[in-house]
Amino acid sequence: MCKIFGHNIKLTILLKANRSMVDNTRKLVYGSSIFGKFMSNLNTKFQFRLLSFYNDKKIIDLIKIVKKEVDFAFFPIEAYHVYSIAKSQSKLDGDMAEVGVYQGGSAKLIAEVKNGKELHLFDTFEGLPKVSERDTHFGTSYWKTGEFSNTSLEKVKNYLSNYKNIFCYKGKFPDTSEPIKNKKFSFVHLDVDLFQSTIDCLEFFYPRMINGGVILTHDYHTDGVKQAFNEFCKDKKIPQIQLLGSQCIITKLE
């Protein structure tokens, strides 16, 4: 009992240290400091070590492979959240979707565990749409219109070509949503960075989530994304659960 208790205390300390490290690292990285990049690499190594406490080596290896194959700006724990939540939701009815695919890193993690479900992927494949005054990091502007344009529909299709039931759509969401307007979803992943894009996704997908369906977002620490979730969830009284790193989940409960 003492051994288990001691191990749990050790893990709790590691988790709290990691949360603080993530927050400070992001502030430094967004400031484009050399020290920030150093801290980012250090944090990545720390998180892989933390994940190895309870997870199969093949999961850790998969995340490492994805980070080598494509530009994938997720910390390891954030990548694991995408993988593990998608895996859990694959046992429920409903399809899966992602808006904000970029080069396909998180889509590959979802594809690995979707259990034959359809995965619908949406992106402009031309970078971010118009950035507004709400789209700040810690109160200062950072994103630029057209950022993350280093991708293409063809590259993502080729990257995910070994997986079945993958459907890709090019254009600004929800303008491209017509093919899925009558579908239901068990899992939706958002990585759209901006306030208006987040609102558009929530308004489209939340009514189409099954009972128990989960929407997971990246960049919840940014002002625009967090404000979008707060505004959308307030009147509907939807609980928001912030995860380690920059993620948040909401669940459809009827």
Enumerate the predicted regions with their spans.
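N-terminal pre-P-loop "Q-motif" helix
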Residues: I77-E78
